[in-house]
Amino acid sequence: EPYRRQRQMCIRDSITGLNNWGEYICRLFTIDAFFLNEDRHMHNIAVLMNGKGDYKYCPVFDNGAGLLSDTTMDYPMEQDIYQMISEVKSKSVSQNFDEQLDVAENLYGQNLQFLFTKKNVSDIVNNADTYPPEERKRVELIIYSQMNKYKYLFR
């Protein structure tokens, strides 16, 4: 298994010419942990290729499963958000967001900082008036909770 993974990494690097995969994955894991995106998997980790065959890392995409957004089945509105936050499981390398983020940061360093403030969050959430007030408040509380948990990610 380790040999197979090492070989896959060598093939990937030689095909794309990109050699900062660890940092890229670490950024994805940071975003996923912070926003509680439980649906990161190998089909939404990608690279882009232009018409000349040059590759670059893909912008982060497919975060629709974040912020306890499945309110019909997994994370009902009437349940305690702090309890649900503690129960969210990642689907990428480990089921534990903190465990996979710790491993990635230990291997590749912390290479992502967030620059937004609680006021920024409040302003954005309050302006999202297409959503009901209780959903907006829930998102705000989730993000505030994550900001407190991951203080080291903010400048």
Over which residues does each language-model region extend?
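Hydrophobic residue at the +6 position relative to the catalytic HRD Asp in the kinase catalytic loop
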Residues: 45-47
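C-terminal catalytic region of ATP-dependent kinase domains
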Residues: 20, 36, 52-155
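Single, functionally critical "micro-switch" positions that shape active/binding sites
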Residues: 3, 31, 38, 43, ...
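A generic fold-level signal
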Residues: 2, 23, 40, 52-53
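Conserved kinase catalytic-core helix
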Residues: 19-40
